[in-house]
Amino acid sequence: MKTKREDIRNIAIIAHVDHGKTTLVDELLKQSGTFRANQEVAERVMDSNDIERERGITILSKNTAITYKDTKINIIDTPGHADFGGEVERVLKMVNGVILVVDAFEGVMPQTKFVLQKALDMNLSVIVCINKIDRPEARPEEVIDEILELFIDLDANEDQLDCPFIFASAKSGYAMADLNDEKKDMQPLFDCIVNNIPAPEGDPDADTQMLISTIDYNEFVGRIGVGKIDNGSLKVNQEVMIVNHHDPSVKKRVRITKLYTFNGLNKVEVNEAGIGEIVAVSGIADIHIGDTICSLNNPVAIPFQKISEPTLSMDLSLIHISEPTRLQLI
């Protein structure tokens, strides 16, 4: 019988370059108490890849987790470019909702649309966070209209069109449910997440099922599979069956040697984890994205989200010259 994990929320963050999603997550980490008051928080904590730090874009998804009151909030950063579509779709498979971060001056930008379209297609709940409202040229009311127009263009359903709006300055450390509210802290955003993002659900008594959505690597333990437990539970030293996503008839019996959950930016070893939790497992040398970790007695794979094929677009034109020239593909 399916039950909800009311103590967990799983969300992804969508934003255009430089609209402030990394600063927003940094501030949530600080104000949730995930980082101690005397602990230094590195700038751009979610930009772990060298190219990401240099360019300010997100290519690989990162996992972090914060605790607000009695609720654990797993936050996953998403790539913003259509070029990394496969990464986007795999990430969204793990969450029940998204936070759309939009600059209060720049408004909706092209990089936002691709990921938002995927989220809407998967019927995920949406919270819109209009960030940088402290900019002198901020125009939040106009940006609200732009966002609603975008939702309509992307065929959002009625519930998605009725999504909550939060107004924030991540840099200054505050969020508001209304533009006239007091500029105090990030609590309005925390409350909005807990109240509007559905809790993950699954059957804790059913056979174990966990879809591997991303792969991490550690030089000491090797490949690490990351995903959400959809049904059942996982334990250290538990024997499970890996079902190959290309051919469900290919199965391999393995043992979970280490099991991790996330706290802040760290992986924390645990002995057991249940439905709705985003976890990492090690000890499986040839685990791959799209594989399903299953119970031995009922190895049923979870359908793998169809990944958009990489695309390359090119515009070619001839320069006006007096004599015809042959255009050759080299």
Each PLM stretch: what is its role?
Residues 127-130, 173-175, 309-319:
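Short, hydrophobic beta-strand segments
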Residues 82-83, 93-113, 125-128, 133-141:
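Conserved Switch II/interswitch segment of TRAFAC-class P-loop GTPases
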Residues 209-314:
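Conserved nucleotide-binding/hydrolysis modules and their immediate coupling elements
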Residues 1-102, 106, 146, 215-218:
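P-loop NTPase switch module centered on the Walker A-proximal segment
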Residues 319-330:
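Single conserved hydrophobic/aromatic residue that forms the stacking wall/gate
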Residues 136-194:
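Canonical P-loop GTPase G-domain recognition
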Residues 19, 81-82, 105-108, 132-138, ...:
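Conserved nucleotide-binding/hydrolysis micro-motifs of P-loop NTPases
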Residues 2-4, 34-61, 84, 150-162, ...:
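Active-site phosphate-binding and catalytic loops of NTP-dependent enzymes
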